Amino acid sequence: MTTICDLPRDLVARILSRVPLTSMRRVRFTCKRWNTISKDPSFAKTHFGKAARQFIMMSQSRVSLMSVKLHGDGNEDELADPYIYEGYRLDVYALGYDKNLKNHKILRFVDSYEPAVKHSIIEHEIFDLKSNAWRVLDATPDWEIDSYQRGVSLKGNTYFFAKEKIVVEGDDVVVIEDFKDFLICFDFTSERFNLDHVCLYRFTLTMERPVREEQLAVLYQQDTCLMEIWVTNKIEPDVVSWSKVFLAVDMEPLTGSFIPFAFFAGSFFIDEEKKIAVVFDKDQEEINDRAYLIGENGYYKEVDLGYMNGYYQQQVDPRGPDPVFPLVCSYSPSLVTIPQGTRGKRKERDY
């Protein structure tokens, strides 16, 4: 008698590719053959290719797990946030991996303003998961990272945009017209920063890591509504090169506004196959979170994600706090369980 485990391998693979990742554990216990198929690298690639892309969106204290399906016709694109969690605002951290010691580490930025010297003092700390302890990193960079610049983890390291550090003595006011951004990489193996000497003129620069590729994508704007997205074709801690522009769009005819995306917002992701970028920002009144779907040949769509605390525009108190812009990060589902350990001890200090 033929059973389901006797079906042709290709047919089984097509069937299993439609199973949600969170249910794959049950698949592996069905029979040895299914377990073997589910662990095959080619199956894993196909499975992730069919799955809806998932992202974590944080807006103030609300954290949402969002699934995204892009069809490219403007009518069937879907953004959904089925899981809502309440959390707290987070400090600036970066997670990486030491390839020599085979150990995960956490980089922490301590940025405090000192009135006596009238500029920020930046310290860096490393948390080693094996030793379960914090220690101060000996680094005196001649650059600084704006608080709204978000790092992106890739190949065990983390990349940031930084700018030249300007130290102002006394009460002088310095106006700098041609600030440039530098791409820097923190190498968790050597525990040092590597600087990419290719400068990028500043205005809006945000990064994204395509979920299925070992690349970085950069959203770039100047003081116009021309938006460009660049993608790397080679990236290592000490070497970065860029491919041609992935997408270049004049946003003014699409939005009817000359105002570009906010320089401290602009979380985004791209779909390289459909040539679509999805940028997360506020609406023009800076009240509701909004997703902007942008593509070639005038493709444009806005999706209202609602007010940051669950209420909509008509319920907003105009005297309330300043708007908090949504932050979206790539998310890859995994069956790996995170081990629970005791909290690491770190020296207390006043900030």
Curated annotation (Swiss-Prot):
Stated name of the protein: Putative F-box protein At4g09790
**Lineage of source species:** Eukaryota, Viridiplantae, Streptophyta, Embryophyta, Tracheophyta
Q: Which SMART domains match?
A: FBOX
According to the record, the signal peptide region is: none
NCBIfam families, sorted: F_box_assoc_1
Q: Which InterPro entries match?
A: F-box-assoc_dom_typ1, F-box-assoc_interact_dom, F-box-like_dom_sf, F-box_dom
Query: Could you tell me which SUPFAM superfamilies the record lists for this protein?
Result: F-box domain
Known PROSITE patterns for this protein? FBOX
What residue stretches are annotated with the F-box domain?
Answer: 1-51
Give the transmembrane region(s). none
Species for this entry: Arabidopsis thaliana
Sections of the chain in a coiled coil: none
